[in-house]
Amino acid sequence: MDHNGLHGFYHWMRVLQNGRQLAKAENANIKVVELFSLLHDTQRRNENYDPEHGMRAAQFARTLRGSWFDVTDTEMELLSEALIHHSEGYTDGDVTVRVCWDADRLDLGRVGIEPKPDKLCTVSARDPNILFWANARARYKA
């Protein structure tokens, strides 16, 4: 996959910014949110349909644990859940997992899709100011 493409490095950095903002507002586990942001699309095989990329990302994260980053068992479970299900449209779950999913969804503007508040998981992500901020960055790929 092209790491400069739609699911590449710049997307990961915007998801990281979104995640940090939401994690602070929602009192989520920032370490898990940051790891999710940087890992969630690393195992994509293409820019289009790749339903197993979340599972591969979770498996990849497990191989990095202990050498590239340290997390508790609980944090690893949260990270794995967020990675595995991030493309499925779920809105329920632990606040940290929901923040991860919203951080990614707030960057849909990069592909011309404006995030719909009713498809977001957290109150903070549905805030009109956050939606505007994230969507503007996504559309202009800033």
What are these language model-derived features?
Residues 15, 19, 52-68:
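An active-site-proximal "capping" alpha-helix that borders the catalytic cofactor pocket
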Residues 30-48, 53, 57, 80-87, ...:
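His-Asp-centered metal-binding catalytic motifs of divalent-metal-dependent phosphohydrolases/nucleases
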Residues 5, 47-51, 69:
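Short gly/ser-rich anion-binding loops that grip negatively charged ligand groups
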Residues 51, 55, 73, 77, ...:
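Short, amphipathic alpha-helical segments
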Residues 1-28, 39, 67, 85-142:
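Divalent metal-dependent phosphate-bond-processing catalytic cores, especially two-metal-ion Mg2+/Mn2+ enzymes
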Residues 9, 13-16, 34, 73-84:
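Short, well-structured alpha-helical segments
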